[in-house]
Amino acid sequence: MGVRVLRKNYLLIATSIAGLSISFAAQSNDQDKAEVFFENNMRQSSEDYVSSKIEQSIENRFRNLEIEITDLDGDDTRYSIFTVQPLYENLDAGRVTFFQGSIIALDDSETLNLGLGQRWLLNDNKIIVGLNAFYDNEWDVGHERMSIGGELLTSVGDIRVNSYKALTNGKTNDEGNEEKALDGMDMELALPLPYLPSTRIHAKAFDWEGEDGASDLEGDTISLRTALSYGFELEAGTTSYDKSHNQDADFVSLTFNVARFHSQQYVEQPKLISDTAYQLTDVTERRFEKVRRQNIIVKQEQTSGDFGIRFKGI
């Protein structure tokens, strides 16, 4: 009788232990699955977050991109890529700092432009005053140049002045001719047409100092520039030269601005017609506008032709 009781109790204990073991194993297995599930979701969430931040950063940088194609007198085509990147912005203090860079391809040569700009917003953000400095490098031949510039931007007109200084001496190009980068300056006045705030007429005068006894290259450029829908901009004009062997040249330029496209693709479009001819309004949106300047290095080339000297880059 005692043996039977002991055997029965032993079986009950063994069964209970087995049940507890199975239950513990099941719970342990569920816990492992939960840990794996949680770990995988955490990893996926982290990867999605990092990927989203990278894509957002790239997208924001890409939006500050401008692509320009210019047909020069039906002969040469110039391709340009610009970017303007904010470095500092304090609208309460009315001050912004930015970087501007560009790469320009023309006549089998490429030019790199790197610049820093500082702008101040004055008179309730109705006036922008700016200063800038640039470094230019035409690496195919090795020309280098720097410039400093100033600008005044308003809704009723703009004024820009740039002074250029060559940093290199004579260089030999692929044709075996000597080229020299020139010092010079330009001044531009831009005025919107009455009742057409998105259309401006630009008048620019320039003067490039000739080398080795050559006459200065002087002239002016007159153009009409208008903003179109979805980030496009069209400019057409002509360049005339004074006392130079260079012939007058016409040009047409089409620009696509990615930032303007993203902000205008749904509702915001350029204001083509205004109720008033001229009105001084807020120009805060222009604080990171591209600096207008002569990005191609102007050069004087010594040739063996009839005239012996010709100017390039303008």
Whereabouts are the PLM-identified features?
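N-terminal signal peptide c-region/cleavage motif recognized by signal peptidases
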Residues: 23-25
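Flexible, glycine-rich linker and terminal segments associated
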Residues: 28-58, 167-202, 208-213, 227-235, ...
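Residues on the lipid-exposed face of transmembrane beta-strands in outer-membrane beta-barrel proteins
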Residues: 81-85, 114-118, 133, 148-154, ...
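Bacterial N-terminal signal peptides that target proteins for export
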Residues: 3-13
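Repeated loop/turn-to-beta-strand initiation elements of outer-membrane beta-barrel proteins
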Residues: 62, 88-98, 122-131, 156-161, ...
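Outer membrane beta-barrel translocator domains of Type V secretion systems
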Residues: 35-122, 126-138
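Transmembrane beta-strands of outer-membrane beta-barrel pores
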Residues: 69-75, 103-107, 118-120, 135-139, ...
